[in-house]
Amino acid sequence: MTNVFTIDAFREEVKKKYAPVLIGLSDDVTVELKPLLKLGQKAREAVVEVFKEFADIPDLEEDDDDELVDEYSLQVCDIIAKAFRLIATKPKKLIAALDEEPDPRIRAELYAAVLNTWKRETQLGGSRALAELIDKFGGAILADLLQYYRVDLRDLFRDEDPLSPRFVLSLVLCLPKDGAFYAERRGGQQYRGWTEDRYALADIYDAIQAGNHILLLANRDPKKPKPKAPKSYPRPDDLEKTTPKPGSFAAMVVRAKKAARERREREEESAE
């Protein structure tokens, strides 16, 4: 498993508190660049999509003319400006201040410098990976962190002295395999507790049952019916969806949905 914490990383965590990036535009104007984790899910996804646009900008060659280099530089500025509109508290003022630089190349470097500062100070790599995990398995991660580490995931979003994304991600990556997080990743809470040891015990149980069955068959009274074959120990992988019993609430819901679908299909055919 990847080691996301080194001695230098620990030193950085101790010396510096995790906080939003503040960009001073003047004595009385400050722009805050919000950490990725403090954005809404749609905004986070939009930021990720913006970064993908950099792949469309071709690599510069030594013999490229100045006009082409300037054009690429302006494209870089436009892409980063899209990100600023999503993460900055005052994006128009920030973009206007950066656009005061007339030289496209220097302007692009200014845009990139601000963006790289935000990426470094907010631990973008850890934030992005952790945000994706929380979006998918937030409840399970919350439960496991409290159970195994006594860490409250909500402290990640505190305004004062919040937990760092890299710290929380390290804990998540080392969660036990029999916990709620790994169960959700495998398909649901029915997998909780099903580690390699549990599967091995289930296999041993089945083998013992099979051996006992063979012994019964070999020593049974021919006049009596054969003993039934033993059932395998139930495993979460073997669980199948059962059809709702007639008359149950689930069956009525299924029947109502089917009737609504058939009625909608008839209406569509009549409209045609």
Curated annotation (Swiss-Prot):
Assembly and oligomerization: Interacts with tail assembly protein Gp24 and tape measure protein.
GO annotation, biological process: viral tail assembly; viral translational frameshifting
Pfam family for this entry, one: GP24_25
Biased composition (Basic and acidic residues): 234-243, 262-272
Keywords: Viral release from host cell, Viral tail assembly
Function: Promotes tail assembly by creating a scaffold for the tail tube proteins. The tail assembly proteins Gp24 and Gp25 would wrap the linear tape measure protein to create a tail assembly scaffold. It would allow polymerization of tail tube protein during which Gp24 and Gp25 are released and therefore are absent from the mature virion. The tail assembly protein Gp25 is produced by a rare -1 ribosomal frameshift. The ratio Gp24/Gp25 is important for proper tail assembly.
Cysteines paired by S-S bonds: none
Segments for region (Disordered): 219-272
Originating gene: 25
Keyword hit for Zinc-finger: no
Stored InterPro entries: Gp24/Gp25 (IPR020132)
Entry protein name: Tail assembly protein Gp25
